[in-house]
Amino acid sequence: MTSLMFKEACSSSEVVAAQLKAEGARYAELGAALRAKPPQTVLTIARGSSDHAAAYVAYLIMARLGRIVASLPMSLVTLLNAPLHADNALAIAISQSGQSPDVIEPIRYFRKGGATTVAMVNDATSPLAQSAQWCMPLHAGAELSVAATKSYIASLAAGAQLAGHWENDANFLAALADLPEALAAATELDWSEAIDVLTPANNIMVVGRGISYPVALEAALKLKETSVIQAEAFSGAEIKHGPMALIDNGYPLMIFATRGPSQAGLIHLAEEMRGRGARVLLAAPADVAERNLTIPVAGTPDLDPIVAIQAFYMMAAKLSLARGLNPDKPRHLSKVTKTN
């Protein structure tokens, strides 16, 4: 059996290529507008996988543009009616469906208050798309599996487009143009070792740091959704502040060690946790001898997390089936979630 989750994840390369072609000029226009009037405040508005994509976007904006970004607790608007000042703010909403009130209402609130509002959304006819000043379609197409894959990767690519065009960095944008090729390569990798380790597992820690932490969050969510594994994501800087007390002999630990300043520390953490008895699955590029799982590299380290999660999705879809589950229809879940 080949799941819809697997098939949809495999199409991410084509999805990103379509988005780059269709929306590049629009992102260039948005980037020019942000350079002409730089926002004092940047907020992200999202739930679930989209919030993990928002964390990646926040990292890019802070690291590359020096703008402080915060994730909005949506209940401040939807439940508490807090008097938030929106003038000269940039509010970025990310959503697959564009249907959830707790994402729509803050965008409407901030737009009314004078903020620049951007909706990265798969359904360009949705209420969220209609509520934002800038609707930036993800071009992921219909996603039938409950587990979001191609729409998440499309959200990461959209965030990279926003940051790249805002910074107006030709080298970064050139690397982004080559991203579909790297995504295609990620679908061909052998992560069977992870399936062998996780098929009998009940729990796991998923670790990243810096630019790779958002995909650790996403991987942990997918392991919960599709394989019913109690998965928790941690920054490599936080795992020693309590969580490693859980480590005992054979405890699974997946570490995303993509290129960049955090990589050396994550490789060292993998070795330390092996010494404590953990069953470590170190996902890293081919030049890291200590790796268990290989991830391809993109044109720049800041895009590596996108190809890393693509490789993970291929494995996760197979793992769910190996555990006797249906990754397309996780129990208790539905494709569109509406919360206030």
Where would I find each of the regions flagged by the language model?
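Active-site phosphate/pyrophosphate-binding segments
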Residues: 2-3, 7-39, 134-252, 323-340
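Hydrophobic membrane-spanning alpha-helices of multi-pass integral membrane proteins
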Residues: 251-259, 308-309
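Generic C-terminus detector
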Residues: 299-340
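Alpha-helix N-cap/helix-start motif at coil-to-helix transitions, marked by capping-box chemistry
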Residues: 7-10, 126, 309
